Amino acid sequence: KSNGFVIANVLRRTFRRRRVSAGSYKPDPGSAPGMPTGSPLSHPSQGFVIAYGPEGYVEHACRDLDEINRFTGVWPVVWVNVIGLGSIDIIEKVGTMFAIDRLLLEDVLDTSHRPKTEYYEHHIFTIIKGGLLGDQFESEHISIFLKKNVVIVFEEKPGSSFSNVRERIRRGTGKMRGHGSDYLYYALLDEVIDKYF
């Protein structure tokens, strides 16, 4: 089966499930459209990169987001992971680097937004609700952008939502390193759904 068929099935499973929203922080009424507004209670944002291909992988914590450019166009697949939604400057810069519309960044920051998938000319945008297991279960707002050779993920909270996918990349087992960004997108969605539902 093609990756597109598999992705469609994963998304179908998502929307058959009950939808649960995390805590909400929306812009004030009358705010200019497309102007991101984060919650003062949100975790500070931190950028991470995992870049990989059949020959290996590299992980990097970004002190400066411009460091992402060292990986894009060099590695077959680049996964940009922004953890925490509290640093608007970081979120906006990632949006600028990857030509993400500011209205979509507003959806990234709206933790009450319902799950959805939208198809654009150069990318797919998905919002999904994940879950963090600890002393008690916590819902998490996750936004994923699939672009050519790049997947950008915004996570509301620090945690281990994608620990299994990371381990598969590190170990080089299965299909992960031999497939493109569309397979990474599918694997991320699949892990969220398996953990949350």
Regions found by a protein language model. Name each.
Residues 1-197:
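Peripheral, non-transmembrane regulatory/ligand-interaction domains of membrane transport proteins
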